[in-house]
């Protein structure tokens, strides 16, 4: 459960990310593919090379979904319902992959914003990404 302090940390961090969210989403996705090669199996139709336009575009989709989640932190299940359906019923993404991408998002954000990435912010973002992952995998059961 996200505390009021967690919500404040997530919102303020996401505000600082601003227009870079799509760029960071693409970088985190590329980092996920490089660090956890099995995640590539869901994207056989993508050019997965460094700097790929397809990876960047999908990373922007990830970032846009997270921006929506930040805006609706008090109703993540409602805000993410369609994405949950897509990933559970159509794409059938292994739930562990959300945790792997979340880790890579944390690393990417820490690399770009080291001064703002305090232990408290790290913990809040980790809890937020975990909450989003839980919602995205809730329909698997």
UniProtKB/Swiss-Prot annotation:
Species the sequence originates in: Mustela lutreola
Entry keyword set: Acetylation, Heme, Iron, Metal-binding, Oxygen transport, Phosphoprotein, Transport
Annotated positions of the Phosphothreonine modification: 8, 108, 134, 137
Tissue: Red blood cells.
Modified residues (N6-acetyllysine): 16
One Pfam match: Globin
Protein name: Hemoglobin subunit alpha-1/2
Annotated residues for binding of heme b: 87
PANTHER family cross-referenced by the UniProt entry: HEMOGLOBIN FAMILY MEMBER, HEMOGLOBIN SUBUNIT ALPHA
Sites of N6-succinyllysine modification: 7, 11, 16, 40
UniProt keyword Iron present: yes
Positions of modified residues (Phosphotyrosine): 24
GO MF annotation terms: haptoglobin binding; heme binding; iron ion binding; organic acid binding; oxygen binding; oxygen carrier activity; peroxidase activity
rRNA-binding is among the record's keywords: no
Top-rank taxon, per record: Eukaryota
GO cellular component: blood microparticle; haptoglobin-hemoglobin complex; hemoglobin complex
Family indicated by similarity: Belongs to the globin family.
